[in-house]
């Protein structure tokens, strides 16, 4: 081995906490150089402040990655501070002549990485960045006019037309990990886990963070739930979704690995189910496409006609929504599921978002921030794009006048009330006929179920019909005032 080949390469882990299908890791391995694996806790991370729920996940995910590296006679170096300063210190200490990483696609992360690349190259340090966090680079799929996509369906067609993604890379059988590593900070010193009271105490009942947990979740989904996915996915009481989103959010599994797992299943899984699931993966791709081309997606209306919308932003309403005390059972069940498990079924996410934005007229950005803090799968692109989609202000958004009726949504997608009973125990004894509208149940039936509205369970904080009319009036006023303004912002 040449002298240059013996110099270590720093492998900078970010939101790619896995050994499987890790292009930066594979390139470092193929270089033949000793690898120094490092994770840096940045004071201003690229994707914005780390939410409390995802901090819990990150703690356990880093533990899992460190365990995997120790099984290969290495370990994960933990360091905190400005990434450039940390990397320069590691380079001086180790003599490393290269830094490899997998790309991130949030605006702040992109600018940080560009600066680091420029500064390290001034020092004659090799830097190499790789894809793998998405099926396709956001700049690759463009319209025939060379512009970014603004509507999902043409984007999906373009993704299909791009051909099958490259097969995922298996982890190297052996890794040459550096034997002499820099001192690592204790993970506990980062204080990622909640202090008392431990509001995350129920998370581990549902989740196993780490690469192994991701692989097991994928295996179980493909074997047990992919068949019938299209029909069952909207029903929150059914175990019918992949629940891979938290693993994807921190890169414990790659989208290419998930996509690959759906190949060759035609004998036992219908093509319709496979395609529908792949379309959900493509929605994540579309969200990152939007964020890449419209960097202010998380803070500004994609459609600037909504800039003049008159939000009520009542703090009392917002707090009732956060606590799951709105008096609408499907909304309350969703918000309590979020608090208990750091996750919420996708159909219910749309329902609770519509209720906050349209029934309560609270700015979508407040809901987005709450989700970012309480979701274990918080994702800068998915979160912002989804909230703007519901608000009607986003790309290819649901029209604002499409206002979910929380009672009808509950009756349609939780007809027996099983989801409600799981998360709103006050209503457990109420029959299916009234469980989605206890405020209309006869007093005798409420008494028999042990329910006193306004005491054991809240009365509705808003009348849906009146709230709908109020929201539409505000929307029409905004539409009228914007009639002479410019068209929606183009992504770019």
Residue ranges and their predicted role:
Residues 1-167, 382, 386, 465, ...:
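Trp/Phe/Arg-rich N-terminal binding region typifying the photolyase-homology
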Residues 25-27, 62-65, 115-116, 136-142, ...:
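Intrinsically disordered, low-complexity boundary segments flanking structured domains
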Residues 54, 95, 117, 125, ...:
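Alpha-helix boundary/capping detector
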Residues 57, 61, 210, 326, ...:
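Soluble or luminal CAZymes and related metallo-dependent hydrolases
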Residues 125, 146-303, 414, 418-492:
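Glycine/tryptophan-enriched, flexible segments
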Residues 235, 239-432:
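Active-site-proximal binding-pocket segments
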């Amino acid at each position: 081995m040449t002298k240059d080949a013996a110099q270590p390469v720093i492998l900078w882990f970010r939101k790619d906490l896995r050994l499987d299908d890790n292009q930066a890791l594979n390139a470092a391995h193929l270089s033949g150089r000793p690898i120094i694996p490092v994770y840096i806790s940045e004071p201003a991370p690229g994707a914005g402040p780390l939410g409390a729920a995802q901090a819990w996940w990150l703690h356990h995910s880093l533990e899992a990655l460190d365990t995997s590296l120790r099984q290969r006679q290495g370990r994960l170096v933990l360091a905190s501070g400005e990434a450039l300063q940390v990397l320069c210190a590691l380079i001086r200490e180790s003599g490393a002549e290269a830094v490899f990483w997998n790309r991130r696609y949030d605006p702040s992360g992109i600018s940080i990485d560009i600066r680091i690349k420029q500064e390290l190259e001034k020092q004659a340090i090799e830097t190499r960045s790789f894809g793998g966090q998405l099926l396709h680079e956001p700049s690759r799929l463009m319209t025939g006019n060379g512009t970014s996509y603004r509507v999902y369906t043409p984007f999906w067609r373009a993704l299909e037309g791009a051909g099958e993604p490259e097969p995922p890379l298996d982890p190297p059988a052996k890794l040459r990990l550096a034997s002499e590593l820099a001192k690592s900070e204790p993970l506990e010193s980062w204080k990622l886990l909640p202090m008392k009271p431990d509001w995350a105490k129920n998370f581990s009942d549902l989740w196993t963070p780490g690469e192994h947990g991701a692989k097991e979740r994928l295996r179980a989904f493909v074997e047990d739930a992919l068949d019938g996915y299209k029909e069952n996915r909207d029903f929150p009481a059914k175990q019918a979704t992949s629940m891979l989103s938290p693993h994807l959010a921190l890169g414990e599994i790659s989208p290419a690995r998930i996509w690959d797992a759906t190949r060759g299943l035609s004998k036992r899984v219908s093509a319709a189910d496979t395609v529908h699931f792949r379309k959900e993966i493509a929605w994540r791709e579309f969200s990152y496409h939007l964020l890449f081309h419209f960097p202010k997606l998380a803070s500004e209306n994609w459609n600037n006609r909504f800039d003049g919308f008159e939000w009520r932003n009542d703090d009392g309403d917002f707090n009732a929504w956060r606590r799951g005390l709105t008096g609408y059972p499907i909304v309350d069940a969703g918000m309590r599921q979020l608090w208990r498990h750091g996750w919420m079924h996708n159909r219910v996410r749309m329902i609770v978002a519509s209720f906050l934005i349209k029934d309560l007229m609270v700015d979508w950005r407040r809901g987005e921030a709450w989700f970012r803090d309480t979701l274990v799968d918080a994702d800068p692109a998915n979160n912002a794009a989804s909230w703007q989609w519901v608000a009607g202000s986003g790309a290819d958004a649901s029209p604002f006048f499409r206002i979910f009726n929380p009672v009808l949504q509950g009756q349609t997608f939780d007809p027996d009330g099983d989801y409600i009973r799981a998360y709103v125990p006050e209503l457990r004894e109420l029959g299916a006929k009234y469980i989605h509208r206890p405020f209309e149940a006869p007093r005798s039936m409420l008494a028999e179920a042990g329910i006193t509205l306004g005491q054991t369970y809240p009365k509705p904080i808003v009348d849906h019909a009146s709230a709908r009319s109020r929201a539409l009036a505000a929307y029409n006023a905004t539409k009228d005032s914007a009639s002479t303004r410019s068209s929606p912002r183009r992504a770019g």
